[in-house]
Amino acid sequence: MANIKSAKKRAVQSEKRRKHNASGRSMMRTYIKKVEAAIATGDKEAAQAAYAVMKPIVDRKAAKGLIHKNKAARHKSNLSARINAL
C-alpha cells in the first residue's frame, strides 16, 4: 500500500474510477445481450426496439472513452446487420 499522501489519494481515485467504469461496461454489455436475445428469438420488432435503446448507450460509452469508437461502431454494425437479416 502507498505511504505518500498523494499516492494514497491516487489509489482511492483509481479504485473509484475502476468501479465506475466496470459498472458502465457491465450496463452496456447487458443492453447488447438484450439485443442478441431478441435476435435469437427471431422477433424483429423486439430486436429493433432493443437496438434503439442500446445504440445511444454504446455511443455515449464510446464518447466518454470507456470503449474505443471503432468497437462501438463494430457492435452497432454487426447487430444491425443481424437484425436486418431476420
UniProtKB/Swiss-Prot annotation:
Keywords carried by this UniProt record: Ribonucleoprotein, Ribosomal protein, RNA-binding, rRNA-binding
Example of a GO MF term: structural constituent of ribosome
Keyword DNA repair recorded: no
UniProt key word Ribosomal protein: yes
GO biological process, one term: translation
Region (Disordered): 1-28
A cellular-component GO term for this protein: cytosol
Pfam families for the chain: Ribosomal_S20p
Highest taxon, organism lineage: Bacteria
InterPro entries: Ribosomal_bS20, Ribosomal_bS20_sf
Biased composition (Basic residues): 1-22
Function: Binds directly to 16S ribosomal RNA.
UniProt-listed HAMAP family: Ribosomal_bS20 (MF_00500)
Family note: Belongs to the bacterial ribosomal protein bS20 family.
Protein's name in the database: Small ribosomal subunit protein bS20
The organism of origin for this protein: Serratia proteamaculans (strain 568)
